[in-house]
Amino acid sequence: MFHMKETPAEAPLREALRLLEGTGLAVALGGSGLLGALGLAESARDWDLTTEADADRVAAALGGLPLERNGPDGIHTDHRIRIAGGVVEILCGFSIRAPRGVVRVPTIVSARVEGVPLGSPEAWAAAYALLGREEKFERLMSWLAVRGADPLVVSRLRAEPLPETLSARLASLPRLLAAPSGPA
């Protein structure tokens, strides 16, 4: 998928998407899968999906698939559901504890590639900054600096209790002038 050199099996990702979207849930691929789709990574160790639906609704939508549930821990204040032995991790209500409060990272579909809904690069840049993953944060910020950022997504993120430096970096991105044509 996405022309990456190394990825986990795609079948569990596609099955999760089929089941979740089939019940009307909005979901989006983030993490290394998103980076790979944007040409910013050559491998992914798992598929990270986000949704704003709660964990009970997600579990019900997965229709009896074997799953593992994890609640808030450490910096994560969300709930996570893992399927296929962790090949797919679904972050339900993706949120991260930050110095100024809990930051809710929205699930926004920015494009579809090979039938897979891609998450917002702006939202994942903010998430990576909050998670202390500086290299991935900078890759996404560089990508956004060239292509432009969706001003509505940036505004939504800046309404969260972000650290001032992160809020300022997001605000400094050039605005996306046209509708995105895809991840390239």
Task: Give residue spans per PLM region.
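Compositionally biased terminal segments of proteins
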Residues: M1-A184
